[in-house]
Amino acid sequence: MINLIEIRRQLHQIPEIGLEEHKTQKYLLTIIHQIIQNKSFIQVETWQTGLLVYLKGSQGQKTIGWRTDIDGLPVEELTNLPFASKNGRMHACGHDIHMTVALGLLEKLSESQPKNNLLFLFQPAEENEAGGKLMYDGGAFKNWLPDEFYGLHVRPDLKVGDIATNEQTLFAGTCEVELTFVGTGGHAAFPHTANDALVAAAYFVTQVQTIVSRNVDPLDSAVVTFGKMEAGTTNNIIAERAFLHGTIRSLTQEVNELTQKRLTELAKGVAQSFDMTIDLKLKQGGYLPVENNPKLAKELMDFFRNETKANLIDIAPAMTGEDFGYLLSKIPGVMFWLGINSEAPLHSQKMQADEGVLDFAVEAIGQFLDIKANRN
């Protein structure tokens, strides 16, 4: 039997950025081969730094998928844990917990050959490159494409035993925005001979806020945030270029596309009014809204509602993004939050998970997947 806490701590020490998860993949393969030895009904495939583990069912009428992400973040860990990472990277989003739970589920569900097929997906690059989309579009699933897909994300402000989801949209769709205004630089004393890109960018940032207040239905949800601005070199030089880096978030793809459209129109309009040019990049890629399948979500929620050790919460959507949304746009499935009882939030340098979640998750989720895997 694998040691979940030891595995989690080993994974916690080797976080890697998306599509660079070579040590992570090697470690996962070591544990997976321990689990599946002498089990001829299991196959393993690699895809770049990702992994697929396929359990062929004795009847194989359908394939049930379980997805976990495996990448870390470019964050310096400040937890002071004895097993803290020391490479300027950190599993600050809890993907070490995700992977460990997946390995525990694989061990539990491979004790005997299931009736239905099972696919365990260890997906790279959730944080930066929408690895789920890359794998799907790249043909990684081959003949193993699931009929139903399930996955989780840890949530610090929920307690161990809490499972939270809903029958609709769980996470927002996101779109990264990169916008550069290009004017004409000059001396601060002679603004009439220059064309100030900083002023244009600042004007745009204030105007873009009207998209949510005046173009989006008040009953819908959207966020437009610019968190980074770079312009100029010193106090007495008018900036020739101004760069803005932001994000669009919405609970439906329709609203996201509307917001992208209006942002583009505003950027072009501001550029024209200031007699400038712009370079605009909108990068949504695979970060679509995470839309749960209502029927499958109800089934999962009913199961955990009746589990004595689980506390099922019907939770409102969150504006966080997740590339599992792309896979769920292709395959019906469900994502849910898993409580880990951490005082520090996701992406924090001090985020710590209660390791008691490991045994709970493997036992509770394992029972649910066992029913799915062995249902006629």
Curated annotation (Swiss-Prot):
Keywords: Amino-acid biosynthesis, Diaminopimelate biosynthesis, Hydrolase, Lysine biosynthesis. The keyword Amino-acid biosynthesis applies. Its EC number is 3.5.1.47. Pfam families: M20_dimer, Peptidase_M20. The keyword Amino-acid biosynthesis applies. It catalyses: N-acetyl-(2S,6S)-2,6-diaminopimelate + H2O = (2S,6S)-2,6-diaminopimelate + acetate. GO terms for biological process: diaminopimelate biosynthetic process; lysine biosynthetic process via diaminopimelate. InterPro entries: AcetylDAP_deacetylase, Amidohydrolase, Bact_exopeptidase_dim_dom, Peptidase_M20, Peptidase_M20_dimer. The active site is at D69, E127 (proton acceptor). Catalyzes the conversion of N-acetyl-diaminopimelate to diaminopimelate and acetate. HAMAP family: DapEL. PANTHER family: N-ACETYLDIAMINOPIMELATE DEACETYLASE, PEPTIDASE M20 FAMILY MEMBER. Belongs to the peptidase M20A family. N-acetyldiaminopimelate deacetylase subfamily. This is N-acetyldiaminopimelate deacetylase.
